[in-house]
A protein has these predicted regions:
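Alpha/beta-hydrolase superfamily serine-hydrolase fold, recognizing
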Residues: 1-110
Length: 110
């Protein structure tokens, strides 16, 4: 994650370092799966489709999500576009976002 910090215009790596503290809210017994989706048990989940900017800090979490999918034997696909911002495909106002938003719509229609 930290390696992507200089390329990410929307999420700073420093936030990722401190977010767990906020999520715990002073509690030491918060289950791991509540702190990060990649720490959860994906057993029984259908196909998962990850859409990332290849230049966002959170793209660095992809190996953790891939490992979680493999542990649960869950099929997954990954789409990663360079030079996009976090959640770009949810803002279908430019070409790349429109293309990937259309892919998401097609997936949801199935």
């Amino acid at each position: 994650m930290q390696a992507l910090n200089e390329r990410d215009v929307s999420i700073d790596y420093a936030f990722m370092v401190t977010v767990e503290k906020f999520m715990r809210h002073g509690c030491k017994n918060v289950p791991d799966y509540m702190l990060s989706g990649s720490r959860g048990d994906f057993t029984g989940v259908g196909d998962i489709h990850f859409f990332y900017s290849a230049d966002e800090v959170l793209y660095g979490a992809l190996p953790d999500f891939e490992e979680a999918c493999k542990r649960a034997n869950v099929p997954y696909t990954v789409s990663a576009r360079p030079k996009m911002v976090h959640c770009y495909c949810m803002l279908p106002i430019f070409k790349e976002a429109k293309e990937d938003f259309a892919k998401i719509v097609d997936i949801l229609k199935k």
